[in-house]
Regions:
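Enzyme catalytic cores with a strong preference for nitrogen-chemistry domains
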Residues: 1-299, 310-319, 326, 351
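ATP/NTP-dependent adenylation/nucleotidyl-transfer catalytic domains that generate, transfer
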Residues: 3, 210-211, 236, 264-301, ...
């Protein structure tokens, strides 16, 4: 008899146990009406992922335990797998419970606990040791949780895109226990190219074990992380048999008939620019919605960073929930004002202009005695930025909207940003995009609709904090800068390795030096969407006080 499976690719809110449970039960009721045998939910679906130090609170764990019991009481005539934290004795486990007819008939504890980059599960959980295989409609189903299927090569696959052709021990254990099918519950966060890596990992394990696999992933934004969904299944030969959508909830049905696994869900993978853009949109939307902000504020400069930020915000929230503010100074070019106004008008957002020169002049008058005999320098440049930051935060304070900052990864790497100025805000949309990536995504966004004026994309980047200023007056070309940042930050390559790739030693040394001396700035920056293999968030934990400079004196 065929086994009908519903893969519940859902957006779970961290800490909102009751709402997550209600969503799961609603899906179960729908599945029963469609004669589904088995409902699969993502990793830690009951409490959301990652719950971080909520896992250290006894009251939080108690709520999860009591809610799980209530869910179990509701289940009849169907099998549900739900992810949750579970305390047993002195130990806490990343668990999955199998519920049938009001009873928890099996419970699995995750065996491979990732403890690298954005993951720190060893801080909270003890690794499980036993495989679990249970029966549904005459089919023996095994369970794994996320990293289990990646096995010993999980770190290399996730961070370096190297998939090891080696059987994962948790998968082997399930196969040896007689499983006909493996279900993998996941909370696997997005970065560019991760979808292909996941596929290759799972296909490899399916082929090595001649075992069909169903991969259920979480979707949604959680602070800096975005979970992109893209759940799928593959047959015992590793051939993809079903593919769910990315960046949206999905209830994907799959049928296992003997050894054949089939589905009508055949979504396509997304290209890199589209996937990254949709990650930004989902990250902004969920950060705003889940934290109950009424809308967002953006300082619109007429430059490409704020233009892309505005486009993402409107796509995430709609024009009515976005306000753009242009704050020109005596150094602002007329084309900047024109382009900012044109873009805001085209998108239909609330737009206003506030001249900052009167405020700047007042500050300079007040500081004239202290600054007597001192030439104009970055102090006056940063003062303009801090005036703008103060204005945006005042509007945020008055109306409750969240300020979206517009700085990019190139600027965050080198400290080309002003503390309490353009860094002032609550969420940094472009924080993990290099300047060149900002240009690529802006071009991509204009293929959907031409909302970013071409002149913004074509003109040389400038902060417009002094006369005739260009970014490359202070920094190497972004082509060189971005490449060095990617090698050093994302792939941990050393100075000598990067120089050996053909970059000038002076450029590499300068950029690496800037990366390390600006750690104090990054530590005070708002969270932002992670879209690369390594961002400046949970997966970048360098000390502020440190003399290390990448061995650049050797």
């Amino acid at each position: 008899m065929p086994l009908k499976i519903l893969v519940a690719q859902i957006n779970c809110v961290v800490g909102d146990v009751a709402t997550n449970a209600s969503k799961i039960l609603s899906i179960v009721d729908q599945a029963k009406s469609e004669s589904v045998d088995l409902v699969v939910t993502p990793e830690l679906s009951l409490c959301g992922y990652p719950p971080e130090d909520l896992l250290l609170r006894p009251d939080f764990l108690k709520e999860c335990h009591l809610t799980l019991k209530r869910i179990a009481n509701h289940i009849s005539g169907i099998t549900l797998i739900v992810g949750h934290p579970h305390r047993e004795g002195h130990y806490l486990y990343n668990a999955a419970s199998v519920i049938q007819d009001g009873q928890i008939v099996a419970r699995y504890f995750k065996q491979e606990l990732p403890n690298y980059r954005v993951f720190d599960e060893a801080r909270y959980f003890k690794a499980g040791e036993q495989s679990v295989v249970f029966s549904v409609a005459g089919v023996s189903v095994g369970l794994n949780i996320c990293e289990d299927v990646w096995g010993e090569g999980g770190r290399e696959a996730s961070t370096e895109s190297k998939v090891i052709e080696h059987p994962a021990r948790a998968v082997s254990s399930v196969k040896e226990s007689g499983a006909d099918l493996l279900v993998v519950m996941n909370a696997s966060p997005f970065h560019s190219g991760k979808d292909l890596i996941r596929r290759k990992v799972v296909q490899t394990q399916a082929r090595l074990h001649t075992l069909p696999i169903v991969f259920c992933n979480l979707i949604g934004g959680q602070d800096e992380l975005v979970f992109d969904g893209g759940s799928f299944s593959c047959d015992r030969n590793g051939e993809i048999s079903a593919q769910a959508v990315f960046f949206n909830e999905s209830l994907m049905t799959i049928t296992l008939d003997q050894e054949q696994i089939s589905s009508e869900f055949k979504e396509r993978l997304l290209d890199s620019e589209r996937a990254t853009y949709e990650a930004l949109v989902l990250g902004v939307r969920d950060y705003v919605e889940k934290n109950s902000f009424p809308g967002v504020l953006i300082g619109l400069s007429g430059g490409i960073d704020s233009a892309l930020t505005l486009a993402v915000a409107v796509d995430a929230l709609g024009a009515k929930r976005v306000k753009a503010v242009m704050m020109p100074s005596q150094f602002t070019a007329s084309m900047s004002r024109e382009d900012a106004s044109t873009m805001a008008s085209g998108l239909g957002v609330d737009y206003s202009e506030i001249e900052i020169k009167p405020m700047f002049d007042s500050f300079m008058k007040g500081l004239s005695g202290e600054f007597l005999g001192k030439a104009f320098d970055t102090t006056e440049e940063n003062l303009q930025s801090r005036i703008r930051g103060t204005l945006l935060m005042s509007l945020s304070n008055k109306f409750g909207s969240l300020v979206l900052t517009t700085g990019n990864k190139s600027e965050m790497s080198t400290g080309y940003a002003t503390l309490y100025g353009d860094m002032a805000g609550g969420f940094a949309v472009l924080k993990d995009l290099t300047k060149q990536a900002v240009y690529r995504l802006s071009v991509y966004r204009n293929t959907i609709s031409a909302c970013i004026p071409e002149r913004i994309i074509e003109r040389p980047p400038t902060a417009e904090l002094r006369a005739d200023q260009l970014d490359e007056d202070s920094l190497p070309s972004y082509e060189i800068l971005d490449a060095i940042v990617e090698h050093y930050v994302e792939y941990d390559r050393g100075v000598d390795e990067i120089v050996a790739l053909g970059y000038l030693p002076e450029d590499v040394k300068k950029i690496v030096w800037l990366i390390h001396v600006n750690e104090h700035k990054r530590r005070q920056s708002p969270p932002g969407v992670r879209v690369t293999a390594r961002g400046f968030g949970k997966d970048w934990r360098y000390p502020i006080t440190s003399k290390y400079r990448g061995l650049i004196d050797q």
